[in-house]
């Protein structure tokens, strides 16, 4: 009987632990969606500040093009930074493995 209770407790623990991890992932996903939408709002606000009633179509397109280039440059910078951090993480993992072994 005690083994049955222990097994049931273990299953309940695993179930709750998995649920907790799923909730953490969902919260992280929702936070990312909130950040993305806040960035979109900021982008539209910025665009609204640059566009004036006297501008023609070509001037507006130029502003959008420049903003797009700026964001693409930022993405490139983030990709490089991410690669550098990944390399450092791999190096630390190797060093930690050597310490443990």
From Swiss-Prot:
Tell me if Coiled coil is a UniProt keyword of this record: yes
Q: Any coiled-coil ranges, and where?
A: 68-95
Q: Which domain of life is it from?
A: Bacteria
Q: Which UniProt keywords apply?
A: Coiled coil, Cytoplasm
Report the GO terms under cellular component: cytosol
Family recorded in the similarity comment: Belongs to the pole-localizer TmaR family.
What the protein does comes down to:
Pole-localizer protein involved in the regulation of several cellular processes.
Question: Could you tell me which Pfam families the record lists for this protein?
Answer: DUF496
Protein name as annotated? Pole-localizer protein TmaR
Please state where this protein is localized: Cytoplasm
